[in-house]
Amino acid sequence: MRHRALAAAALVALAGCRGASDRPVRIGSKNFTEQVVLGEIAAGALEREGVAVERRLDLGGSFVCHRALVAGELDLYPEYTGTAFTAILKRPPISDPARVRADVAAAYAGQWGLVWSPALGFENTFALAMRGDDARRLGIARVSDLARHPELRPGFGYEFVERADGYPGLAAAYGLAFRARPAEMDLGLLYPALAQGKVDVVAGNSTDGLITAMGLTVLEDDRHYFPPYEAAFVVRGAVWKNPRVRRALEALRGTITPDAMRRLNAAVDRDGKSPAAVAREF
């Protein structure tokens, strides 16, 4: 009787392990074009290795995705080292990319058992942008130049306004005091609002495809406020142990240049292609 009970327990345990290993890898992303494209690229890479995936893309901001990963509701999602360093770990910005990556990798492994994949090959830092004609007319080329123009109307994403490494820290570092309260909106509405003249300055991302397409001027971060934002995937440790998952993500090391990421983003935002189609063509 005892032997049958032990055998039954062993079968239950084996079934549980088999179920966990057979479960599709759940891939998440934040809610803007680049993130969804990267999620699709990861999904395609895993599928080519014979790994079943479940796409949970376009979820929300950094905190939403991080909490889902820690809670075991996601298995991986694309993230940026600077975001992890300042927004998640609440550390003051530093400019050394190697140190940021090392500190982030150690902290994520120690606190949550999470692994950072090799860097994808590009950074996506915050970028303050203006209509090109306005920037030239007003002689604005650097973020510090904005301090002389409090009349300009800023427009920012919700997360940029809330994050310590976003607008609050930027305003303090550069002495910015716009007369108008920043208009807060979804990231996808920033460039249309700029094109329609509803705002004058937006905080986008340096790899946004519409920057070139719209002829915008990106202002130089002349006080080096923003930390490095290298792109990679954050993966649950148990999932990273799967050799096929690891092989798929390691194969993406250094494969996406900044220009390539801008082209991928533009193919979605300007040309109207789906993120899935763009990822397949990558």
Region roles according to the model:
Residues 34, 159-173, 244-282:
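An extracytoplasmic/periplasmic, membrane-proximal ligand-sensing/linker region
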Residues 14-16:
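C-terminal motif of bacterial Sec signal peptides marking the signal peptidase cleavage site
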